[in-house]
Amino acid sequence: MITMSSFKYAGLIISIIISLISCTHNKNYPTAFQPELAKAEAMMYRYPDSALHILQGIQPDIPSENEQYATWALLMTQAQYKNQIEQSDSLINIAYSYFTKHDNAQRKALALYYKGILRHESHHAEDALSFYLEAATEIEKTNDYQLGFLINSEVGLMYLYRKLNDYAMEYFEKAHHNAELSDNQTYIAFSFIYIARAFSQKKQYLSLIHISEP
């Protein structure tokens, strides 16, 4: 015979189950954070300080093997760099570990690029160049032309510093192509400066005149 106490007991069991499910769900990256990540990424290039503010408000506490957490770590690395905030490699290592195992060329390229940036800042030039070159390969699979400009510029500058002028010019031309496709006027201007530096180092001064002509 079903009594009122049986209903109460069943209700208690259901409440406990729902509570456990809710707790388990909260340990995963909340889906509510996804729009915030998208918003931060959308304003990263023009308003990196605003992007950083959004990302700082998320503060996830979840396993690193989670796409949204890895995305947060990657974007936080990017935002801190753009805001000239000193950082360790702990966040980029999370992003790198995740995205190098998954089929997302843009995210992989971005993670490789910032691995290179942080290795370069810690005076490990060979490691940095290796990451940049791998990033340059990945970015060709995407239409993220702003990132393409940044990656190819870094490779070109490293080759220019080593006086490997032909290699530098190859990557500066790729950077210029990406800058034009991105329609970012600042990047276009810098791409001409980089090409001019390569021509100057090669002592091809007539070529400098040609690129300065409208």
Where do the protein language model's features map onto the residues?
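Bacterial N-terminal signal peptides that target proteins for export
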Residues: 2-11
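Residue-level detector of conserved catalytic or cofactor/ligand-binding positions
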Residues: 207-214
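Amphipathic alpha-helical segments of tetratricopeptide repeats
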Residues: 56-61, 93-101, 133-143, 173-183, ...
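N-terminal leader/linker segments that initiate helical-solenoid repeat arrays
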Residues: 23-75, 82-89, 93, 102, ...
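Conserved alpha-helical positions within TPR/SEL1-like repeat arrays
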Residues: 74-75, 81, 110-121, 146-161, ...
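Bacterial N-terminal signal peptides
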Residues: 11-19
